[in-house]
Regions:
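Conserved nucleotide-binding/hydrolysis micro-motifs of P-loop NTPases
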Residues: 36, 47-51, 115-116, 139-143, ...
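Accessory interdomain/linker segments of ATP-dependent helicases and helicase-like nucleic-acid enzymes
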Residues: 205, 222-261, 276, 283
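Glycine-rich phosphate-binding loop of ATP-dependent small-molecule kinases
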Residues: 431-493
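Conserved Switch II/interswitch segment of TRAFAC-class P-loop GTPases
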Residues: 105-107, 112-118, 126-179, 489-493
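C-terminal effector/interaction modules appended to NTPase cores
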Residues: 2-40, 102-103, 253-444
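Canonical P-loop GTPase G-domain recognition
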Residues: 171-240
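Active-site phosphate-binding and catalytic loops of NTP-dependent enzymes
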Residues: 66-70, 81-93, 188-197, 230-243, ...
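P-loop NTPase switch module centered on the Walker A-proximal segment
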Residues: 7-117, 129
Length: 493
């Protein structure tokens, strides 16, 4: 196989993410700073696990020797770097998608770029992933881009992280250096929602602790990367997750057929179940679950279906059908954390639209409240954001839309923000708080302003950057507690 032919094979896996609907499939993201060895690590994993054809092996060997980028060693990154610009620069720019199977499991590997200027591509990949492999160069330790990528993984709801400390061969296989990096990352991860962090020392180029155990690191008694990936439990939706069907379109055919079509975002539905349109409150009983392959006895997350009901509901695209007892929130006031993806900074004077699963809602007002500081990972008060920033924002919508909080139901708790001028995506984020109706300041609304907080809860804080960040954190935590108790709150600090 020529390099041109290999290029075609890899490009086919770069441009568009494959269908991600498979019960036993793990969606795996590799991320980290530039030159930490992400593409080399995944290429090595594919190579050692016999996931590469003989033709591809021959092409990679020939290309590696002709380029001599690593002396006589194989350039495993060629298996992932499919774009011409990537091969010329030796970096990853776009997201590379690669299927990978072992006797025990199937994977979709998402190789994300490390350069800061391509962070938005990494965020796109993270939004599809179940597990993240976060690489760190053992020579350099945790860097700013490492923190940024960890924050984006947390933002996108990834719960399991593999900390792959790479290039251990270049520091003499030093256990103290590895332990120091492991400890530093564990400390910074305390501010995130990760439920499992597994640190593995590796050398991607030589294959140590990738698919085979390293004789050079006898002090390490944990799993190899390959062993971990075969054993890790994939993300599984709770069996009792509430039912959500964002309506994509209403189908009409054969005179009396009327089906509310969409992809089940959460939960399970069966004929005989009672459902409700969250926005209008109109309810009906599911009479039939229609698919391209005929009627189904039930439908669950990821299934594309058309529900036939015993009563016609006057709804359209953007509606969310749910179970009666656990409905989404109908909200026109949101608080969200987002990553800004556009080269053009946020401008409150420009028009934006909020796109949820199938709904598109005009934004009437949006303000930035805080930015994540990638040195300290604290939220610092701010009023502007630019490309690659992670911001906490308050968003007022022109009308209510049906949604959930991301922590409760990720499938219907995320969104993208698009430009009202050209439809380009400018940000992607998650909903942290929502309510119906913008509260007007008055006797029934508690206003948490700076003066009130400074008299009590924050009386011990000064004006230093650290104290300012803590002031903001306490204000937000107080607001969350009050809102959970049913008290309408405005935070004005």
């Amino acid at each position: 196989m020529s390099m041109a032919a290999l290029h075609e094979v890899v490009l086919d896996q770069v441009a568009t993410p494959p269908a991600l609907q498979s019960g036993g499939m793990v969606r795996l993201l590799t991320c980290g700073s530039v030159d930490d060895g992400k593409s080399t690590l995944i290429g090595r994993l594919l190579w050692d696990s016999a996931a590469v054809t003989e033709d591809q092996r021959d092409a990679i060997l020939q290309a590696s020797h002709s380029r001599a980028v690593n002396g006589e060693q194989i350039d495993f990154s060629l298996l992932l770097d499919g774009l011409q610009a990537e091969r010329e620069q030796g970096i990853t720019i776009d997201i590379a998608w690669r299927y990978f199977e072992t006797p025990k499991r199937r994977f979709i590997i998402i190789d994300a770029p490390g350069h800061e200027q391509y962070t938005r591509n990494m965020a796109t990949g993270a939004s599809h992933a179940d597990i993240a492999i976060l690489l760190i160069d053992a020579r350099h330790g945790v860097k700013r881009q490492t923190r940024r990528h960890a924050a984006i993984c947390d933002l996108m709801g990834i719960k399991k992280v593999v900390l792959a400390v790479n290039k251990m061969d270049l520091i003499g296989w030093s256990e103290p250096a590895y332990r120091a990096i492991e400890t530093e990352f564990a400390r910074l991860a305390q501010g995130f929602g990760f439920t499992e962090i597994t640190a593995i020392p590796v050398a991607a180029l030589t294959g140590d602790n990738v698919a085979r155990r390293s004789a050079c690191m006898a002090w390490y008694d944990g799993p190899t990367l390959f062993d971990y990936l075969e054993a890790v439990e994939p993300r599984v939706e709770p069996a009792d997750a509430p039912f959500r069907l964002p309506v994509q379109l209403v189908l009409r055919a054969d005179g009396d057929f009327r089906g509310y079509a969409g992809t089940v975002a959460s939960g399970t539905i069966r004929p005989g179940d009672r459902i409700v349109d969250a926005r209008s409150g109109l309810g009906a009983v599911v009479r039939r679950i229609a698919t391209m392959d005929g009627a189904r006895a039930f439908a669950t997350k990821g299934d594309a279906v058309a529900l036939q009901l015993d009563t016609e509901l006057d709804i359209s695209r953007g509606a969310v059908l749910s179970e009666v007892s656990r409905r989404p929130i109908n909200a026109d006031v949101l608080e969200a954390r987002l990553v800004w993806l556009a080269e053009t900074p946020f401008d409150p004077e420009l028009g934006y639209l909020l796109r949820t699963a199938t709904d598109l809602t005009p934004v009437t007002s949006m303000s930035v409240q805080a930015l994540v500081d990638f040195e300290t990972l604290a939220s610092t008060p701010a009023h502007a954001c630019a490309v690659n920033d992670i911001a906490d924002c308050r968003i007022l919508l022109g009308r209510a839309t049906s949604l959930d909080l991301f922590r409760d139901l990720p499938a219907t708790g995320n969104f993208i923000l698009v430009s009202a001028i050209d439809g380009a995506t400018v940000a992607g984020g998650v909903i942290t708080w929502a309510q119906s109706g913008a509260p007007a300041v008055g006797e029934n609304v508690l206003v948490l302003d700076r003066a009130l907080l400074a008299r009590g809860l924050c009386a011990d804080l000064g004006d230093s950057p650290a104290d300012t960040a803590e002031f903001h954190r306490r204000a937000q935590e107080a607001a969350i507690l009050l809102r959970s108790a049913g008290v309408p709150v405005l935070v004005e600090i």
